[in-house]
Amino acid sequence: MFENLNLDKTFQFLLIILAFLMPLTVFGGNLIIVIICVLWLFSGNYKSKFDQIINNKLMLASIVFFCIHLVGLLWTEDLAWGLHIVHKMWYFIGLFPILYTIVRKDYISHYISAFLLAISITEVCSYLVWFEIIEPFKHATVSNPTPFMSHISYNPILAFAIYLVLHEIFFNKKITNFVFSLYSFFSISMIFNMFITGGRAGQVAFFAMLVVLIIQILDKQRIKSLITIFIVIPGIFFTAYQASDLFQKRVNLAFNQALEYQPGS
């Protein structure tokens, strides 16, 4: 069906576009995902794809995870809600296995560059709204400047972007002075942006990411890793708590909710 189409290059082009659109538009990202899935389903070579998927433990775990949700429908008290959850989990059996068969190591730097470019656009817009240089638009408000998506989605994506940039700073031995300076500024601005927006899940992911990064940097030095974690994490947390009214309110709210929580309520 696609004899005259270079499918591999087409998939790489679509993946780069997907990486760029993910932080900017849910609709655009979903549209690219649909195109990728349709192309994959009609591109043939099914036995090779199937063998590639079932011979990977992570992909098998992804499929089993989805199937567990599916089997759980047999004893759910709310079938409509159960179907809703299963619908949200489709990518464990559909998207992830498909991506596994088409992602190419040689193009990973292109995926990351496209993703970080999009993050830089969202960040610039976020600061423009926060400094009241432009009027808030779409999801953004001055007090919670996340224009292209809600803070619930934005902050976890921002945490992932921070990890990618910091990983490049600490582990890329060939990084130039200019790129090092650019990435250092970018990481600081993203970390600050993390705490002027209100996504608690993303902020938790940020601190978890820092723990992982510190352990990676201080590989096999457990004592140094623990000491660094116990200094850096509380240091950033309390600095953000004092500097950001929004972060302070979110922390206080989470603390109060934890105190008021009663099992079974």
Residue ranges and their predicted role:
Residues F27-Y46, V86-I98, S153-I162, V204-V211:
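Membrane-embedded alpha-helical segments of multi-pass membrane proteins
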Residues L58-F65, L79-V103, H110, A114, ...:
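Aromatic-anchored transmembrane helix interface
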